[in-house]
Amino acid sequence: SSATRQNLLSLQDTAQLMATTQNRLATGKTVNSALDNPTNFFTSQALDSRSSSLNTLLDGISNGVQTIQAANQGITSIQKLVDQAKSIANQALSTQLSTTGTAANTASTTSTTVLFTINGTSVSATTSSSLSATVAALNTAVSSASTTSNGSFGAGAIFSLDSTGTKIVLNAQADVEFQNAASQAALGFTSSSTTASTYTAGGVTASTVVSSDLSISGVTQRASLAQQYNNLLNQITQLAGDASYNGVNLIAGKGNDMNIKFNDTGSSNLNVASVDATASGLGLSAITNSNSSTSQTGLGNFLLNADVNKTLATLTSAGNSLNSAASTLGSNLSVVQNRQDFSKQ
């Protein structure tokens, strides 16, 4: 009958409404398909797509923030190592060099060419039958070498005669080493095969100095400080290589720039330039046993004060470069964080 049919249709409508309601409760969506409400459905689709794009952009921006922060922390740590290297160089500068001793024997009375180095500078003089003349020739050669060298040996004579006038006395605020045993013996000093340093300059290497009547101080200490300095340079390079995030490192070398996009098309973006904060990138060279007057790399085991001062100047320049890089990274970080907050709104 008509009433029965009407009741059946009502039950079907109720069942359909219940199914729709249950579906909405299950999905949390009022509109589940274009059939429910075409306008709302496609508007929702567009908004979902926009939300997904923003989340992707925010992920990229967040990675950028973390990468910049890692680089900035790396620079801060490297700056501490540079300051420590400065401290070591200053310690070397304050370590005094001295060579002292009185010859055990009388100097040669025949004409003999004596070869020695003072702080790595080659010096030669000729002995004479007169000890006073020999001493004068030695001091003249030292004075001449001092004026032409890149490091001064100090004022005054370093060679003299003892109270008996028969033996040569050496008293220098410098590293004095003979180039061969014959030169050392010619001045009356006991020869030895043990060197006080491994200093090389202009192709000349000292070979004898340490003996019972001749001693040197400060060389070993400065060489040890030079090794500590070299170890710090290795740490600087390693630290720069470890300051990465998600495979991106902004301070281990140039050419590894990072581009952060702020919109879907990439038309709004920020390029963060990488820097080289390794030891070589900062212009810091390892200290070797050759001084700066040679073509070899290095600054002579910190033996010359002039070379140590050059190292300090290089460290100051490296510190300035790090400060500049940190300032640039800080500015970029501020921009990225600002855009991150904007994208979250």
Q: Where in the sequence are the language-model features?
A:
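Primary detection of the long, small/polar-rich alpha-helical "axial" segments characteristic
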Residues: S1-Q345
